[in-house]
From Swiss-Prot:
Family label: Belongs to the acetaldehyde dehydrogenase family.
EC numbers, comma separated: 1.2.1.10
Active-site residues per Swiss-Prot or TrEMBL entry: C129
Protein name per its UniProtKB record: Acetaldehyde dehydrogenase 2
Pfam families named in the record: AcetDehyd-dimer
UniProt keyword annotations, A-Z: Aromatic hydrocarbons catabolism, NAD, Oxidoreductase, Plasmid
Gene Ontology process terms (BP): catabolic process
One GO molecular-function entry: NAD binding
Catalytic activity: acetaldehyde + NAD(+) + CoA = acetyl-CoA + NADH + H(+)
Length: 312
């Protein structure tokens, strides 16, 4: 199958890890350029060493590169503010976009839940690291029961939280909570992120609580385990920390939730950990690794969809 040429905008930790993942192999994408703004960037140096064309002149430099005309899709690993400007330029030139920032111009995308298969969409958003790790589980429960409320807690090492994450905690929680509802299928979603200062650094840990209608527990468990297997196909370090737990609440003992009210039904608790692949980032940076792995998977799906549309 023919491959679509792609560019990575942003040569920091996220962009560099994504570069390594793409260079390790893709059936759909061929890395044609890495873009940064710092001529001394380690990411740009690593790209050059591996034979990938680079520019340190940002989006303007990319547009001037001879490879630009053949690039069909770009991964943006910069900032929400920068992404809006990048998208305007690339949309004008008919390029597809995978947005790893909180800009959320395009629809939220979680590869095992809503892969990018709509040929009318050209810009997709990868939500947040917490969303990529937890929304598949909310969706798994939603597949077998109506989920009234879902709450996730993402705990990540302080070392793996860069300045962008620290400056946008509120945006992280809002974006993740919204995607818990729109992609995960919960009527109401809530998200919490914890920056863990422990040394040595701990790998990413996630807790997911769902409150759903009463349903057979085996159906929920089977759906959750099947979803975990799907995520593991592109994030091998994604795993269940302990058995899925259940608790039933009847009319004689309803659960009281601040801001929600009383709940009767099934509470499902899922505890996960995410270990990074160590491609460029440390193994404890599972929160960053799941973002780059998901972006690669979603980008491949988006590229394949548009190539099939063009060939039709």
């Amino acid at each position: 199958m023919a491959k679509m040429k792609c560019a990575i905008i942003g040569s920091g930790n996220i962009g560099t890890d994504l570069m390594i993942k793409l260079l390790k192999g893709s059936d759909t994408l061929e890395l044609a350029a890495v873009v940064g703004i710092d001529p001394a960037s380690e990411g740009l140096a690593m790209a050059s060493e591996r034979g990938v064309p680079t520019t340190h002149e940002g989006i303007e430099g990319l547009c001037r590169m001879p490879q630009y005309a053949d690039i069909g899709i770009a991964f943006d690993a910069t900032s929400a503010y920068a992404h809006k400007a990048h998208d305007e330029i690339l949309a004008r030139d008919g390029k597809l976009m995978v947005d790893l920032t909180p800009a959320a111009i395009g629809p939220a995308t979680i590869p095992p839940v809503n892969p990018a298969v709509d040929a009318a969409v050209r810009n997709i958003n990868m939500v947040t690291c917490g969303g990529q790790a937890t929304i598949p589980i909310v969706a798994a429960v939603s597949q077998v029961a109506k989920v009234h409320y879902a709450e996730i807690v993402a705990s990540v090492s302080s070392r793996s939280a860069g300045p962008g994450t620290r400056a946008n905690i509120d945006e992280f929680t809002r974006t993740t909570a919204r995607a818990i509802e729109t992609v995960g299928g919960a009527a109401k979603g809530r998200a919490v992120i914890i920056l863990n200062p422990a040394e040595p650094p701990m790998i990413m840990r996630d807790t997911i609580f769902t409150l759903s209608e009463m349903v057979d527990e085996d159906k929920v468990r089977d759906s959750v385990l099947a979803m975990i297997a799907r995520v593991q196909s592109y994030v091998p370090g994604y795993r269940l920390k302990q058995e899925v737990q259940f608790e039933r609440f009847g009319s004689n003992r309803p659960l009281k939730i601040p801001g929600y009210g009383e709940f009767e039904g099934l509470k499902t608790s899922v505890f996960l950990e995410v270990e990074g692949a160590g491609d460029y980032l440390p193994n404890y940076s599972g929160n960053l690794d799941i973002m780059t792995a998901a972006a690669k998977a979603a980008g491949e799906s988006l590229a394949k969809t548009h190539m099939e549309k063009t060939a039709a």
